[in-house]
Regions:
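Histidine/acidic-residue-rich, glycine-tolerant segments that coordinate divalent metal ions
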Residues: 59-60, 81-83, 87-99, 105-106, ...
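Acidic/His- and Gly-rich active-site-bordering loop/insert found
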Residues: 2-100, 109-112, 116-124
Length: 178
């Protein structure tokens, strides 16, 4: 794990820049059009096959490497909340009454960091699918993507999602089946 963290440390400032961009431009559930375009453009630039509009405003990016037959999914959420941000930070929301107060900007930035690392190193043998899910806050985005054929169009043996949890010990990963 230390080797991976060291490899990603050179991208730390870029990941912050992605997060700050997303934080300044929050979009509510099923209205993440600008977010989807931004993410898709980055992923295409790194060589991913990108599909937009999955489940209305979701993005799925796929990369194959080697001759492996396993296919995994890595998932992050993209929507913001209808909450006024009270921060004075330089990357404060520019949209009145909307903000990324639940951390989905961070989730997306972390998955973009993983995407760039995987594209650069191709450190896997099989297929990786990056799932940028809309509308997590209203609990409709996953269903919309599944009903839009997510798993038929992008077969996966396993999907890994994540959520940042500020109260958990820094530098630790916690897993649960689900």
């Amino acid at each position: 794990m230390d080797t991976l963290l060291n490899a990603l440390s050179s991208d730390q400032e870029q990941m912050k820049a992605w997060r700050h961009h997303l934080h300044r431009h929050p979009e509510l559930a099923f209205d993440e059009h600008g977010t989807a375009r931004y993410i898709a453009e980055l992923l295409r630039g790194w060589g991913y096959e990108v599909s937009e509009g999955i489940g209305r405003t979701g993005v799925v990016a796929r990369m194959r490497c080697g001759d492996g037959t396993k296919s995994i999914g890595l998932r992050a959420d993209t929507d913001a909340l209808a909450v006024q941000e009270m921060s004075d930070s330089d990357h404060k929301s520019t949209v009145e009454g909307r903000s990324h107060t639940c951390g989905h900007d961070g989730h997306s930035a972390m998955l973009l960091g993983a995407a760039r690392y995987l594209a650069r190193t191709r450190a896997f043998n099989g297929t990786v699918n990056l799932i940028f899910q809309p509308a997590e806050e209203i609990m409709g985005g996953a269903v919309a993507m599944i009903e839009d054929g997510l798993f038929e169009r992008f077969p996966m043996d396993a999907v890994f999602g994540m959520h940042n949890m500020p109260k958990l010990e820094r530098g630790k990963l916690y897993f649960t089946a689900g």
